[in-house]
């Protein structure tokens, strides 16, 4: 039986939400994103095992907005309450409960969904101070669980993840097992590769190319971001053009695309490129969606 669920991570700015998500995912998701996006938009971290999938939604820090952008960020964070089954409300152990926390608590009460209080940064306080913090927050709301952690050091993080696993219900695997985020980097990577294909082949295969990012992961051995992409075309003749004589064209496409991708990610990249024929994919709705041309997403 496969189990799955969506979990929001809410809290004031700088309480360690992203640090927690990065630790759970085993890599810095923020590295593979535009800084403005990672701080202003919801970020999805997809944690998948053989039997479970937890889709974490890291949110912008909730604060009193002073600009339209601030309004957007806060509403973006609160909008996740309509999308998830569980909320992790994260607070810092080394700061007392404030007005910002109280504001969030009132919204959480109104949402009527299970809330786990996560007290982060326990490595910074004495156990007595932690107990006071627990009692204070417990007096404000009926939390499903209260879990103290140190996201930076990893203390008790696995316990929290196991708790979430235990509370998952039977469900679908919403994302492929090798996908760890919904970041637009996959889309940008595919566009960079497609741009090189169009540039180098000029008018030979202008409209029949789609690029799918099959996987994008950090290789712990080489410390490179390993990206596998498939260039889709509609005819065998187009496949031959893109591969080129003895693979020369495909190698050139990969070399130029890798350079741009490394500049975007700020990381060393190993880019693996493949070419496949998918006849008449441009006229098939399922193929269009599979290749990233989903009207709802872009």
Swiss-Prot record:
GO terms for molecular function: GTP binding; GTPase activity; ribosomal small subunit binding; small ribosomal subunit rRNA binding. Keywords: Cell membrane, Cytoplasm, GTP-binding, Membrane, Nucleotide-binding, Ribosome biogenesis, RNA-binding, rRNA-binding. Residues 3-170 form the Era-type G domain. It is found in: Cytoplasm; Cell membrane. Residues 201-279 form the KH type-2 domain. NCBIfam families: era, PRK00089.1, small_GTP. This is GTPase Era. It comes from Streptococcus equi subsp. zooepidemicus (strain H70).
């Amino acid at each position: 039986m496969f189990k799955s669920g969506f979990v929001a991570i809410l809290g004031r700015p700088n309480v360690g939400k992203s640090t927690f998500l990065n630790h759970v995912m085993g890599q810095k998701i923020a590295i593979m994103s535009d800084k403005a996006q990672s701080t202003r938009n919801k970020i999805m971290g997809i944690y998948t095992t053989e039997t479970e999938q937890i889709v974490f939604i890291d949110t912008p820090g909730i604060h009193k907005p002073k600009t339209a952008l601030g309004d957007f960020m806060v509403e973006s964070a609160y909008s996740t309450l309509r999308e998830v089954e569980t909320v992790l409300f994260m607070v810092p152990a080394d700061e007392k409960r404030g007005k910002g926390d109280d504001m969030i608590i009132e919204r959480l009460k109104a949402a009527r969904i299970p809330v786990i209080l996560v007290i982060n940064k326990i490595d910074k306080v004495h156990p007595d101070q932690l107990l006071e913090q627990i009692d204070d927050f417990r007096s404000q709301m009926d939390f499903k669980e209260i879990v103290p952690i140190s996201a930076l050091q990893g203390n008790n993080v696995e316990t929290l993840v196991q708790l979430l696993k235990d509370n998952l219900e039977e469900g679908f695997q919403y994302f492929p097992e090798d996908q760890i985020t919904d970041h637009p980097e996959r889309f940008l990577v595919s566009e960079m590769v497609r741009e090189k294909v169009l540039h180098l082949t000029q008018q030979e295969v202008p409209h029949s190319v789609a690029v799918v990012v099959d996987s994008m992961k950090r290789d712990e051995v080489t410390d490179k971001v390993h990206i596998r992409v498939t260039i889709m075309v509609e005819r065998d003749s187009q496949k031959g053009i893109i591969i080129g004589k003895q693979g020369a064209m495909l190698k050139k496409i990969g070399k130029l695309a890798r350079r741009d991708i490394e500049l975007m990610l700020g990381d060393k990249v190993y880019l693996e490129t493949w070419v496949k024929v998918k006849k008449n994919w441009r006229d098939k709705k399922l193929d269009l969606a599979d290749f990233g041309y989903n009207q709802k997403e872009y």
